[in-house]
C-alpha cells in the first residue's frame, strides 16, 4: 500500500440504483477530473462545489454518462488529500465503465478501508473514530448508531485523552526527579503523582466496566428459543416479529430446521433462533433438527425456555432443563390466556420467569423488557450522552494499562525505584495509546481496515 498513489473505488453498494458514486483520492484527483470530466460551464473546478457535465472516454471521444462532479481539495476532505467524487447513473455497467476509465487515467483500485485508513494516517481522525465509521454503516438499532456516532464525534477519544494527560503529568514529575537525582521525591509530589495516576485509573476502569454493554449494543445478542413440541415456540417467534414467519400447527414436530431472524428489541439487536421441539423421536429428519437445536445451546447469549403453562411439567421439559444447566436462560411460560397448570421444579425458582400469550400478546412486552434488562441498562439505550468502548481491542489495551497502573501503585507504596515506576507509566501510556492509534503497528491497521468495504 502506497500513500502517494491516487486510489479509486465505487462507493455505492453493488447492483442497480438511482445513483452510483466513484470516489478518487490522491494527488492526481484534479488531473483525472480535467482529463475525463467536461463541465457544462467552462472554467476551473472550485473546491466543494458540484458541477454538472459529461464523462468522456478520451480514447474514443464518446460520452459515457452525464455526471455531477465535486472536487474537495486538501486538506479539507475526508482523507486530507484531494478527493474527487463522480456521481453518475446507478447502473452497474456505467459505474464500472467509469471506474475503469479513472483507473486508466492514473488511479489504482483502492483496498478495503483505504480511504478511511488515509484519513487516520493523515491525522484527520484517530483509530477509534476510524472504527466507528464501520460501526455507523453496520448499526442495526438507533442505540448502536448513537453510540457509534458519539465515538465518531470524538467523545470516547476525549475520555481516553483525559486519562492519558493525567499519566503524562505523573510521568513528567517522576522523570524530573530522575534527571535531578540529588533531589528527593517530596511528599507533595508523591501525592500529586498518586492523585494523577488514580484519576487516570478511574477513567480507565469506568470504560472497562461499560465494555460488555458497549459490545452488545454494537454486536447484538443471539437468543435461542427452545422447548418441547407445541410449547408455543414458533408462535412466540411470530409474535416477536409481528409476522407469520414460522409455520404453526397443532401437529408436533412442524419446525425441523432452525429459523433465524433479527429484531430490534428496544435498542438492542437480537438474533432470534427458533428450533425444533425437543423430544424423543424415531424420525431421522426431526432428530437432526433436534440435534442442531441442542448444539446451539452453548453458543447462544440467552435461551428462552418455552414451557406450556396449560400442561404439567413433563419428561420432555426435564430433558431440556437438564441440557440447559450452566447456560443463561429465562423460563418463558406460554398460553397465559389459558388456565395455569404448570408447576416449575424447585431449581427454577431463582430463574427469571415471564408468562405470555402469543395469541393475545399478553406478557410479550414484559418478556422483551426482561431480555433487554439482562444485557444492557436503560442508560445505555436512552442516555444520549452515553459512551463506551465496544471492541475487544479497546478492552484488551485498557486492561493492559490497568495492570501496569496496578504495578505502579504497588511500587509506589513499597518504595520502588523511580526508573521502575517510570517504566510502569510508560507501559500504561503505550497501552492507552493503542486504543486511539497513537501507538500501533501495520498488522493491527491491516486487521482493522480489512473489515471495511472497498470505497470507504
Swiss-Prot record:
Binds 1 potassium ion per subunit. (6S)-5-formyl-5,6,7,8-tetrahydrofolate binds at residues 23, 85, 124, 456. CDD domains: trmE, TrmE_N. Its cofactor is K(+). Residues 220-376 form the TrmE-type G domain. GO terms for cellular component: cytosol. Disulfide bonds: none annotated. The keyword Ribonucleoprotein does not apply. Keywords: Cytoplasm, GTP-binding, Hydrolase, Magnesium, Metal-binding, Nucleotide-binding, Potassium, tRNA processing. One of its GO terms (biological process) is tRNA methylation. Its EC number is 3.6.-.-. K(+) binds at residues 230, 249, 251, 254. It is found in: Cytoplasm. InterPro entries: G_TrmE, GTP-bd, GTP-bd_TrmE_N, GTPase_MnmE, MnmE_dom2, MnmE_helical, P-loop_NTPase, Small_GTP-bd. It holds the Pfam family TrmE_N. GO terms for molecular function: GTP binding; GTPase activity; metal ion binding. Belongs to the TRAFAC class TrmE-Era-EngA-EngB-Septin-like GTPase superfamily. TrmE GTPase family. Homodimer. Heterotetramer of two MnmE and two MnmG subunits. NCBIfam families: mnmE_trmE_thdF (TIGR00450), PRK05291.1-3 (NF003661), small_GTP (TIGR00231). Exhibits a very high intrinsic GTPase hydrolysis rate. Involved in the addition of a carboxymethylaminomethyl (cmnm) group at the wobble position (U34) of certain tRNAs, forming tRNA-cmnm(5)s(2)U34. This is tRNA modification GTPase MnmE.
